[in-house]
From Swiss-Prot:
GO terms for biological process: dTDP biosynthetic process; dTTP biosynthetic process; dUDP biosynthetic process. Phosphorylation of dTMP to form dTDP in both de novo and salvage pathways of dTTP synthesis. Its EC number is 2.7.4.9. It comes from Geotalea uraniireducens (strain Rf4) (Geobacter uraniireducens). PANTHER family: THYMIDYLATE KINASE, UMP-CMP KINASE 2, MITOCHONDRIAL. This is Thymidylate kinase.
């Protein structure tokens, strides 16, 4: 069985950059690595992603949002994640179920029991072996996110960046509470530090977890 590692954090925390760096390092170490993301990761889930993140869809209700995430996740897990793990690969996933709890639970205020049920249904009980939480102040993350959006011609994936600072603070608080509740699964990394310092901290933690077998 492979190893399932997820990355979480507020907008602009640096997840995507760090996943690429870790994938390169693990590949050089001889691991077969799959890099994926949520929402998305496969054609059907990518179509849901386009709807979820399009800034033109601000009329979307929280419940619609939750159900679209669950549908995309169910397809992604069965089509991509589980087959890769069965093939003894390391799967690095940019967001997973914790994002739904943080964003739709803490951020939107949806019922935790409903979210837990849908997460369990969509994942068929699959849980990450390790979750890397890149934590940084909301203001720092949002500035990075908007710099990225403004630098990308025709960027449309900005619906969550347009939410209030208060919303993003609730999301961050949610992530930190999740990490507090499951310290054996989470590691918290300071996402406001430099890329190299962050990479070193993540690499050390991941290699230690892989060495556990």
């Amino acid at each position: 069985m492979g190893c399932f590692i997820t990355f979480e954090g507020v907008e602009g925390c640096g997840k995507t950059t760090q996943i690429k760096l870790l994938a390169q390092h693990l590949t050089e170490q001889g691991h077969t690595v799959i890099v994926t993301r949520e929402p998305g990761g496969c054609p059907i889930a990518d179509q849901a992603r386009a709807i979820l993140l399009d800034a033109d869809n601000r009329a979307m209700t929280p419940t619609t949002e939750l159900l679209l995430y669950a549908a995309a996740r169910a397809q992604h897990v069965q089509e991509i994640v589980k087959p890769a793990l069965a093939a003894n690969k390391v799967v690095l996933c940019d967001r997973f179920t914790d994002a739904t709890i943080a964003y739709q639970g803490y951020g939107r205020g949806l019922d935790p029991a409903t979210i837990a049920y849908l997460n369990d249904l969509a994942t068929d009980g699959l849980k990450p072996r390790l979750t890397v939480l890149l934590d940084c102040p909301v203001e720092v993350g949002l500035k990075r996110a908007f710099d990225r959006i403004n630098g990308a011609a025709g960027a449309r994936e900005e619906r969550f960046e347009l939410e209030s600072v208060l919303f993003h603070r609730k999301v961050r608080d949610g992530y930190l509470k999740l990490a507090e509740d499951e310290p054996e699964r989470f590691i918290i990394i300071d996402g406001s530090q430099g890329v190299q310092e962050t990479e070193a901290a993540i690499t050390a933690a991941v290699l230690a977890r892989l060495a556990e077998g």
